[in-house]
Amino acid sequence: MIKGIKFISIPVRDQDRSLEFYTKKLGFQIITDQPFNDKQRWIELRIPGADTGVVLFTPEGHEERIGAFQAVSFWTNNVQKTYDELVSRGVEFLAPPTTADWGSSAIFKDVDGNQFVLGSK
């Protein structure tokens, strides 16, 4: 049976620029950074303490996915506090956090315009 999600792949335009964003601004750790082919590297990151990896890789022929909404939601215990911290690091949000019956959330963008949800668990 399926045990979990090994990694999600985020399409990026410039792997070095994206690697800096995800490690320096979001605090992800590098798990693997090695050549994949003559054009790209296989870069796998992980949120400290998490099981699921994040791969910064765009399969050839899928460049149109760069900058799209990724339907990925990252969670935190305190959306407002995390929002404030990420804004201070230069992360761009579409709007401040909002609160609904199910919790708080805010949408942020990476350096390629990919959009992600930051939400409470």
Residue ranges and their predicted role:
Residues I5-F7, F69-V72:
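Eukaryotic phosphotyrosine signaling hubs
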Residues P48-G53, G61-E63, V79-K81:
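Short, charged/polar surface micro-motifs in flexible loops or helix N-caps
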Residues S9-T52:
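Core segments of cupin and vicinal oxygen chelate
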Residues M1, I10, I31-Q34, R41, ...:
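Vicinal oxygen chelate
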Residues F21, Q80-E85:
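Short amphipathic alpha-helices within nucleic acid-binding modules
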Residues Q15, N77-Q80:
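Helix N-cap motif at beta-to-alpha junctions
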